[in-house]
């Protein structure tokens, strides 16, 4: 599938992705997938650009795979949010007009939200001094953004080191803090649809939810309103801190969050070894009816996959349908697919986000 931005080809490309997902899930008797499309442009809420010197000036640049010495200079980026496209020329004019901002600048990162927040990270091959900080303060004020300066071993924050997102799920607005440098869903509109699908698939439950790989609480917040109690795990300290803030900010008080990997939690549930991070949490007090997983591209490792088998319901969000199919193959003797969906997080690429609800046979 072409990675070229061409809205006229969008519908055909989405149909091809849906056909591929049907093909991968057909051996498991999957129902027809729900298909959630993306805006055709301005859908990507974050972007990262290297800078390239040409004509005595630094320009935004991207590179084709395997061609890191052949820059493609760009002035706008139609797949990025309108806020990013509005900021790009203003930021470029600012560094071109101020040597304190321009000197040894090599990379720019944007993070925006559907709520209108924006953060810009400027990366340098030099130490950041007071003159840079003064220029960055003025820049932040003029552009109405937070500015993060990064150089080797140092980070300078002008404003906040996070952006704020608001997402509407089933009639309720959830507020999320998205830290600089941490993972966030890039396509906000599709993320909102994906959360709505997961919320509906979860259903109203009177038992408990186990969530693996919870990140900043993207799914945790809405799903917690559908369960009695939630035990959520995440390994990234930055994401854990953001998730704890987001739970408190949204008044969600039925979630315990622990910094464990999925593999470590498997050991804890199987009573292989105790974990200090689980002190005060009685795993046997939970009545888990559903496990929610959103693993990395490699999918669930075999032990985690076996762990999920003990649950009546498995709600699985996947960024790689190939490994999703491999995991389902491991589970198909005990679970069947009740519903499935395609979420077009990454238009004009071959990448697919999908979801399945597996229930015990």
UniProtKB/Swiss-Prot annotation:
Q: Which GO terms describe its biological process?
A: tRNA methylation
Under the GO molecular function aspect, what terms does this record hold? rRNA binding; tRNA (uracil(54)-C5)-methyltransferase activity, S-adenosyl methionine-dependent; tRNA binding
**GO cellular component entries:** cytosol
User: Which Pfam families does this chain map to?
Assistant: tRNA_U5-meth_tr (PF05958)
Q: What is this protein called?
A: tRNA/tmRNA (uracil-C(5))-methyltransferase
Question: Which organism does this record belong to?
Answer: Pseudomonas entomophila (strain L48)
- Return the EC number: 2.1.1.-, 2.1.1.35
Bridged cysteine pairs (disulfide): none
Q: Which reaction does it catalyse?
A: uridine(54) in tRNA + S-adenosyl-L-methionine = 5-methyluridine(54) in tRNA + S-adenosyl-L-homocysteine + H(+); uridine(341) in tmRNA + S-adenosyl-L-methionine = 5-methyluridine(341) in tmRNA + S-adenosyl-L-homocysteine + H(+)
Q: Lineage from the top down?
A: Bacteria, Pseudomonadati, Pseudomonadota, Gammaproteobacteria, Pseudomonadales
């Amino acid at each position: 599938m072409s990675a070229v931005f061409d809205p006229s080809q969008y519908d055909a490309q989405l149909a091809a992705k849906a056909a591929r997902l049907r093909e991968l899930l057909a051996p498991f008797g999957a129902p027809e997938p729900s298909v959630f499309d993306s805006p055709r442009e301005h859908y990507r809420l974050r972007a990262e650009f290297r800078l390239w010197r040409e004509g005595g000036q630094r320009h935004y640049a991207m590179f084709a795979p395997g061609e890191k010495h052949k820059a493609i200079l760009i002035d706008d980026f139609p797949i990025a949010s309108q806020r990013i496209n509005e900021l790009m020329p203003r930021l470029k004019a600012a560094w071109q007009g101020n040597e304190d901002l321009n000197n040894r600048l090599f990379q720019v990162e944007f993070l925006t939200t559907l709520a209108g927040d924006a953060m810009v990270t400027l990366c340098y091959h030099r130490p950041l001094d007071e003159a840079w900080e003064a220029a960055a303060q003025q820049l932040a004020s003029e552009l109405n953004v937070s500015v993060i300066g990064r150089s080797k071993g140092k980070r300078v924050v002008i404003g906040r080191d996070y952006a704020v997102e608001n997402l509407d799920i089933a009639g309720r607005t959830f507020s999320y803090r998205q830290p600089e440098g941490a993972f966030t869903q890039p396509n906000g509109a599709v993320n909102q649809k994906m959360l709505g699908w997961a919320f509906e698939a979860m259903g109203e439950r009177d038992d408990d939810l186990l969530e693996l790989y919870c990140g900043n609480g993207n799914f945790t917040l809405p799903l917690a309103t559908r369960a009695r109690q939630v035990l959520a795990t995440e390994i990234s300290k930055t994401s854990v801190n953001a998730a704890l803030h987001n739970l408190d900010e949204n008044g969600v008080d039925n979630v315990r969050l622990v910094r464990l990997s999925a593999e470590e939690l498997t050991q804890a549930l199987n009573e292989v070894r105790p974990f200090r991070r689980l002190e005060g949490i009685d795993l046997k007090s939970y009545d888990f009816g559903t496990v929610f997983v959103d693993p990395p591209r490699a999918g669930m490792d075999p032990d985690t996959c076996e762990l999920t088998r003990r649950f009546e319901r498995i709600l699985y969000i996947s960024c790689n349908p190939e490994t999703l199919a491999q995991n389902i193959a491991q589970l198909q003797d005990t679970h069947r697919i009740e519903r499935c969906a395609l979420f077009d997080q990454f238009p004009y690429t071959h990448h697919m986000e999908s979801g399945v609800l597996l229930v015990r046979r």
